[in-house]
């Protein structure tokens, strides 16, 4: 815990030296596992929220945490065959919707 606080202080000091200041503090919570840990501001999330998650790969810990903690409807996207196969083997809640498509700068293949 002390290490995390030290990192925050050093990060804030570095930003201040660059001329960046914090105008407002927000409530932050981190969820996920391995390389998929993401920080969110949960204040406006509810069971009526819809989340779109892109490039899920084989790590849906963050996605499942959003459903578990906030009851959101979550749409996960990843076109890679490995991810499609892996997701197909998982037991996911009904609020989790997987789409085997991705984002690109153009339409088509």
Feature map (PLM): residue ranges:
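Phosphate/nucleotide-binding beta-alpha loop and adjacent structural elements of enzyme active sites
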Residues: 1-109
